[in-house]
């Protein structure tokens, strides 16, 4: 078997070749290729004339030997037009009911059925068996169907509670396509002279029958780690608890997990990673409402839980809370304390400075810097006599901010613990302390916890960086996940600097 990274590179080049000349269809091609390489079915929803059939035709060129069958369903379509006409010779000579399947669905590797919901019950029932069991009953015999990819298309969804729901449930990947939107792409499409029937894939990239069969075994060997399973189960529980969530059968979950295994395998990994779960957004929706719902739920999962983002923020919140507790304890110990005076009949308490304060000026540190009079202040210098007068009689108090300039009016008070508290214009306050008593350093306990948390963040970011190279995931998702991780990292760094 090829080295995993070489295989991933080959599949990437194969997809690029298939995408040539198709504008704004890269994601659809890649998911159809993934479906073809893992033997799954795709439903394309969109208006006529947006290259749905061309996507299916292109996928034939992914293989060295692949026969294609395509058919436009109508209300009058018959099984003979899809599965082959009856053999008149066999019926006449031997009385056998047998179809001539050459050139029809039972002998095709790539199948495209347009306007699928117009098919009648006879076609639908046979098609269900073909998809489920990859077998076709031809008269008295069961014939194996080589179908690797079924692409069904329509410009509408099946009606709810109709006989079509069973077939719709078999369409694992569901893609909602629209017209070309970008101006430059629209122009390129208009002037393109590419022949749609040309094979754009070099022979060296095409998949042989032997490779395809071996890969089916290899896909099944891809592991599902416990943390990834927990994410899947969390998503399932979230959907079960939402009133408007689509019903997802156990069969559909199981088939979706195999698709995730295929995504991991063709990305060069030996285990399903959280990044692969984004594919579920194209597997679990039923209609427009549930499509938006799946997008929202997966975004919550990917940006909040897949790489422990929310768990790390919760831990950070606990660390910050503990730090505040320690700071409060330290603040109580180091805050400058005045002496309460006055008899029991005094109208208001008054205070005096401690006897050890004897200098004509007194500089006190803010335990937490504040912005006062448009200045970031870390200490205030008071005239001792002015401070004593304020402590005794109240009124206005002034001090030099950071010890410079003219003395400025301060919003200051004595709290219940007899500490001096200064407040800014928003009434945020901090206690004052004598120089040499304020504790500036972060407690060792908090430092260690923040270091451990930052190391855990680095590990999660490294995991994401190693896993993000997935051909089948749109780059927009990678950007949102990276932003969520960077936000967590920034909050941790800010906490370390405080």
From Swiss-Prot:
Gene Ontology terms: cellular component: cytoplasm
Documented EC number(s): 3.6.1.-
Catalytic activity field: ATP + H2O = ADP + phosphate + H(+)
Top-rank EC class of the record's enzyme: hydrolase
Location of the protein in the cell: Cytoplasm
Keyword Membrane carried by entry: no
Keywords: ATP-binding, Chaperone, Cytoplasm, Hydrolase, Nucleotide-binding
InterPro entries: AAA+_ATPase, ATPase_RavA, ATPase_RavA_C, MoxR, P-loop_NTPase, RavA-like_AAA_lid, RavA_ATPases, RavA_LARA_dom
Function in brief: Component of the RavA-ViaA chaperone complex, which may act on the membrane to optimize the function of some of the respiratory chains. RavA functions as an ATPase.
Name this polypeptide is given: Regulatory ATPase RavA
